[in-house]
């Protein structure tokens, strides 16, 4: 809409965030601007819980899941690696049998995040309007990606990348 276009033209990152970032705070001057941290909140929470288990309680074997974002360390009680199953996005679309991909959590990474546009959408005729908003346009994403899975050391980082990938086109991610 024209209101979204006006806001997009008049607001930059520097206009939104003010202050000294060394004090670990952000400040916004314009009341119309809203900040949301949905893109990393669940992953960050999983990281904080995992760090608490590890560094505060001395627990070295755990798996933490917060809203689908996972952080794991060590092994299961049977000394086997943690195994995470990821639903194939086409399962939701075609009403077929659940297809699962299995990911072994090992020493190469400790976190996994999955983001997708195959569950939260509105169908208007032949057009699908997804829940991911492209900050470049202020409109629902027009991505050709159905789901993104990211494996890394920190769930917050995996969560951020998976969310970002869902508004990008495949050609932008893998040139």
Question: How should each PLM-predicted stretch be described?
Answer:
Residues 1-175:
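Mature catalytic core of soluble alpha/beta enzymes
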């Amino acid at each position: 809409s024209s209101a979204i276009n006006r806001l997009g033209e008049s607001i930059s990152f520097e206009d939104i965030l003010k202050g000294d970032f060394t004090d670990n705070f952000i400040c916004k001057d314009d009341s119309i601007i809203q900040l949301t941290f949905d893109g990393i909140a669940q992953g960050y929470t999983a990281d904080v819980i995992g760090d608490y288990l590890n560094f505060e309680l001395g627990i070295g074997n755990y798996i933490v899941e917060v809203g689908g974002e996972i952080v794991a360390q060590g092994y299961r009680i049977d000394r086997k690696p943690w195994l995470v199953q990821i639903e194939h996005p086409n399962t939701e679309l075609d009403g077929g049998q659940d297809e699962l991909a299995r990911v072994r959590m090992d020493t190469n990474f400790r976190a996994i995040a999955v983001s997708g546009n195959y569950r939260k959408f509105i169908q208007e005729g032949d057009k699908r309007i997804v829940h991911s908003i492209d900050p470049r346009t202020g409109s629902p994403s027009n991505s050709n990606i159905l789901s993104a899975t990211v494996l890394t050391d920190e769930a917050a980082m995996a969560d951020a990348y998976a969310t970002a990938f869902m508004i990008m086109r495949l050609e932008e991610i893998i040139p």
